[in-house]
Amino acid sequence: MDLSPATIYSRHRPSPCELRPWLLAHGAPEAEPGAYQQVLARLGRRHEANHLAGLGPVADLSGGTFAERIGRTRELIALGERALYQPVFQSTIRIDGADVRVVGIPDFLIRDGAAYRVRDCKLALHADEGRHPEILRQLELYGWLFERTAGAPPTALEVVLGNSTIVEVPFDGGDRALAALHEIRRTTALDAPPYSPVGWTKCLGCGFRGRCWAEAEGRGDVALVYGVD
């Protein structure tokens, strides 16, 4: 199983859940996105496209095989390309004696002096520990992958919020993001799924809601009691 910023996102969204990454890693069937999720996806693509349109000439790396995109990313960074769209990074980390591949595809790399700014578009209006810690971890992981690829840290990690405000995320060398990946990897490596209580608000928008609620009802889970969430 590859790890990526999306792995961290799955742990936090649509709500924090220890079970969701395990289900994804083990190929559990997931419901198709509902109308609301589809609208969010369209808005996200439009937000990204609008920012892309305002950047001027950009090397578009969104096409090609995964291996080709990785190689092209390295090549263009070495050449000092002014801006890259959908670059691909890959590295490995060691978790419990095993090498695990880590991949990441930030939206943009923007040339800044001798290095680059890593920039990603989000619909969220905030990016902080209290409201969207997963955004911080994702950007930190992109920064770590960039440093492993380019041999130097990014000059900045930036989020383009849903209102087009650009917010900078402090770079800690990737420590917190890697710690999050270690935790998730150890959970997904379990033979049996971890327990995570269902909740009306917690499970809204999750593709595994039907599965988890059916199992909770089957075992008479206390989390089904009214007022327990």
Region roles according to the model:
Residues 17, 108, 142, 206, ...:
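A residue-level signal for conserved active-site and pocket-lining positions in enzyme catalytic cores
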Residues 79-182:
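Mg2+/Mn2+-dependent nuclease catalytic core
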Residues 1-5, 186-197:
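Short, intrinsically disordered, charge-biased short linear motifs at domain edges
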Residues 1-115:
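Metal-dependent nuclease catalytic cores that hydrolyze phosphodiester bonds in DNA/RNA
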Residues 10-23, 192-221:
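Cysteine-cluster motifs in flexible loop/terminal segments that predominantly coordinate metals
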